[in-house]
């Protein structure tokens, strides 16, 4: 607003992601308080999540991954509150806002929207009577859907108007990628498992291009942190330490819940 410096503009844009990272850290902290009895355990949970190398990296530059992580943390926080307090008005309003913002991030974050619907519907079943509480289901469900529409609906309406009904923008994105992208990234030239006749199992063990690992190992180590175009890997020791810590935690909690 007050300068034409390109550097200042870039830093200002990055600050949005920094603030989203702070928001995600706060929600993760609150989730830890709700999930664990001991404060120390909840804080360790927040530290392990927020200081993952991949997490720190994603909140340091301009992208929509930050919004996706922030909103999914908010959604998980609402799930935890719903388990503890029930679907109160405050929880429903927060859930609606969180889901609406999530819709404005990446499509691959939409799984949380689907599971939120399943989780909410499950909560509306009276377990003792094995009956649906239809009144609460419709009342609170419509409230959340209305908030989602207010937060995110305008974007999809705009896209539908601008792109001849392509409200998701996927077809338009492919058209412009074919027109303007470099040759190896044009949709018609991209090498995909589906074009190679691979099965799901083949895809899991496939090592594409110059990658060092197959898809399964890449997913595991990128959970901790992989950079560039998923081709810059951290020292293996760091990835192994993180994965061992998470594995021990999962096994320990599973043992206690038996």
Model features per residue range: what roles?
Residues 91-107, 150:
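Membrane-interface alpha helices of multi-pass inner-membrane proteins
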Residues 54-68:
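Short acidic/glycine- and proline-prone juxtamembrane loop motifs at membrane-interface regions
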Residues 78-84, 112-148:
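Perimembrane helix-loop-helix junctions
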Residues 11-36, 74:
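Transmembrane-helix motifs of polytopic, lipid-linked glycan transferases
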Residues 213-258:
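Hydrophobic, aromatic-rich transmembrane alpha-helices
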Residues 33-36, 75-91, 102, 124-127:
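Membrane-interface transmembrane helices that cradle and orient dolichyl/undecaprenyl
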Residues 27-30, 67-85, 97-99, 115:
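Specific aromatic-rich, kink-prone transmembrane helix
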Residues 4-7, 28-51, 70:
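Transmembrane-helix signature of polytopic, membrane-embedded enzymes
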């Amino acid at each position: 607003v007050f300068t034409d410096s390109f550097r200042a503009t870039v830093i200002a844009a990055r600050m949005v992601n920094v603030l989203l990272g702070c928001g995600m850290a706060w929600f993760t902290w609150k989730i830890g308080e709700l999930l664990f009895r001991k404060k120390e355990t909840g804080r360790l949970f927040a530290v392990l999540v927020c200081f993952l190398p991949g997490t720190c990296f994603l909140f340091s530059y301009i992208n929509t991954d930050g919004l996706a992580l922030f909103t999914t943390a908010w959604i998980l926080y609402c799930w935890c509150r719903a388990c503890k307090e029930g679907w109160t008005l405050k929880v429903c309003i927060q859930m609606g806002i969180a889901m609406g913002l999530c819709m404005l991030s990446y499509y691959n974050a939409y799984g949380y929207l689907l599971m939120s619907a399943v989780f909410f519907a499950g909560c509306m079943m009276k377990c003792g009577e094995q009956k649906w509480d239809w009144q609460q289901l419709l009342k609170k469900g419509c409230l959340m859907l209305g908030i989602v529409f207010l937060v995110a609906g305008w974007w999809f309406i705009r896209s539908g108007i601008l792109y001849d009904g392509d409200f998701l923008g996927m077809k338009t994105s492919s058209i412009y990628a074919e027109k303007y992208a470099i040759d190896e990234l044009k949709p018609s030239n991209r090498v995909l498992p589906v074009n190679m006749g691979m099965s799901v199992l083949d895809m899991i063990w496939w090592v594409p291009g110059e990658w060092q690992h197959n898809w399964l190992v890449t997913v595991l180590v990128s959970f901790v942190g992989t950079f560039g175009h998923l081709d810059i890997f951290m020292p293996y020791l760091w990835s192994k330490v993180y994965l061992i810590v998470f594995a021990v935690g999962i096994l320990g909690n599973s043992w206690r819940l038996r």
